[in-house]
Structure formats: C-alpha cells, structure tokens
Amino acid sequence: MFWGCFSYDKKGPCYCWQPETAQEKRIAEQEIEQLNCQIEQSLRDQWELETSMRRVNLRRQPAGKKPQWKFTKKTGKLSRGGKGGIDWYRYQKLILLPKLLPFAKECAIERPGTLVQEDKAPAHNHYIQQRVFDLQEVSRLL
C-alpha cells in the first residue's frame, strides 16, 4: 500500500507500506504498555469526574452499586487489533511523527493557518492521534 501527502504547491514525503515483522510487533507491544502507564492516571481522573457528575442526584440516591474503575479499551486503554494491516500505532510511528507533521509545519511557515486533512480511516481517526497533533501544534480536519 502507498501513502503520500502534498500541498497546493509542494510535494510531500511518501511511503510504501511493508508487512510488519514479529520483532516490530514485540517492540510495539512494549511501547504501547509504556504509553498505557503514562496515560492511565489522567484517564482515570477524567472517568471519576464524569462518573461522579453522572451519579449526582439531589432527590434520591442513585440505583445500583457504585461503578469501579477498570482500565479497558472502553475507558481508553491503548491496544492493537489482531488482524494486521495499518493500525493507529504503525501510522503514528511510520507516517505521522517522521513524515506528515514535519511537512505540515514546513507548509505552515509559508502558509499560516495550514490544516492537515485526512479521511476517517481507523488509523487516522483514533483518539490518540489528536493528542499527537495537539502536542505538535498542528491543526487537522477529519
């Protein structure tokens, strides 16, 4: 599969996707575990705030037992799908950080207000990608 980017008057970098090796998969799993350790506390704080606000009821006690925190995919735990192909992690490591964001910053120098436009492919649309764009101070349009 091929990936490329361009601007109004510039050709950007491109990339030809190769199958992922077993060693790359092991390294990816280790890095994802490290990322999960970094983001778990902030996600837990956010969950506790949202859950407690949802359970506030001035007239009576909420029904059922109090929800317990579990760090799962539903609450924001990062994981990879088992099917292979291009997922959020490979897209971030091979395209977003080394190729797309530097090109977008270069374009923003000549054209302030530059936006990165992507389709809603699962690798592009993953919630963690927005954090990367925010950290790099690049605007995007999905």
Model-derived segments and their meaning:
Residues 1-142:
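Surface/interface recognition patches
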